[in-house]
Amino acid sequence: MSKLQEIIIEAFERRADITPRNVETHVKDAVMEAIDMLDRGTARVAEKKDGEWIVNDWLKKAVLLSFRIHDNQFIKGGFTNYYDKVPSKWADANSRDFREGGARVVPPATARKGSYIAPGVVLMPSYVNIGAYVDSGTMVDTWATVGSCAQIGKNVHLSGGVGIGGVLEPLQAAPTIIEDNCFIGARSEVVEGVIVEEGSVISMGVYIGQSTRIYDREKDEILYGRVPAGSVVVSGNLPSKDGKYSLYCAVIVKKVDEKTRSKVGINELLRDI
């Protein structure tokens, strides 16, 4: 464990006593270093190792501590102003910073300090919260939201109005993860640490949390908290045992084929900056 991790973990244990006025310099410096690491993408709240997603809880603790050590402050917004503890990711950016960063940011898209936006990302008017990681080639479409610490893979399309849940508390919960080459349909919600594995397609209006039944009709089995790689998922219902009513579920109707991929493929013309 690094010294940085030790400082943050120790401070988190006494977080209730920490305020912007009494926080020690070394704690504040450690928290801001962790936030900067998240902001640059050199550290991630969750990362895949040997096929498994590993959560770095100490970084989640750093994000939570950042709210304890800052007062709300006046934040200029050009056409409007804000009042918050966390500044905008690009509060002090100039045109050169944007060119070197390689992402396209369409007004009034917002990303908070401590989120990472990789080169080749397109942010339509959308929102990316602190601790989130958005990888290269991804489109975050209009009114989509990427919650705190959520992990979005490469070449993902988050359609209009999509909600990707944030998970800062409880700390043992894993963040919501959308792996590479996924398509999330308009107005769908993926929350509570659910993992959508690589190459999956989620249809419009599908809601998936940890308690949502995910029914694989080919295998006639029910999953929770995970959409297997290459799945095509739509909203549906499963009947009760007595047949008197049905309850919502997500249905895996098939695995992705080339025809489906061609329909949801990334439009490179829209990604070129």
Curated annotation (Swiss-Prot):
List the subcellular locations.
Answer: Cytoplasm
Oligomer and partners: Homotrimer.
What enzyme category does the UniProt record give?
Answer: transferase
Q: What is its main location?
A: cytoplasm
Its pathway, per UniProt, is: Amino-acid biosynthesis; L-lysine biosynthesis via DAP pathway; LL-2,6-diaminopimelate from (S)-tetrahydrodipicolinate (succinylase route): step 1/3
Q: What is this protein called?
A: 2,3,4,5-tetrahydropyridine-2,6-dicarboxylate N-succinyltransferase
Q: Where does substrate bind?
A: 104, 141
Q: Which GO terms describe its cellular component?
A: cytoplasm
Going by the UniProt record, its keywords in alphabetical order are: Acyltransferase, Amino-acid biosynthesis, Cytoplasm, Diaminopimelate biosynthesis, Lysine biosynthesis, Repeat, Transferase
Return any one Pfam family short name. Answer: Hexapep_2
Which family, according to UniProt? Answer: Belongs to the transferase hexapeptide repeat family.
What is the reaction catalyzed? (S)-2,3,4,5-tetrahydrodipicolinate + succinyl-CoA + H2O = (S)-2-succinylamino-6-oxoheptanedioate + CoA
GO BP, one example?
A: diaminopimelate biosynthetic process
EC nos: 2.3.1.117
Which molecular function GO terms apply here? 2,3,4,5-tetrahydropyridine-2,6-dicarboxylate N-succinyltransferase activity; nucleotidyltransferase activity
| Record InterPro entries | DapD_Trfase_Hexpep_rpt_fam (IPR005664), Hexapep (IPR001451), Hexapep_transf_CS (IPR018357), THP_succinylTrfase_dom1 (IPR023180), THP_succinylTrfase_N_sf (IPR037133), Trimer_LpxA-like_sf (IPR011004)
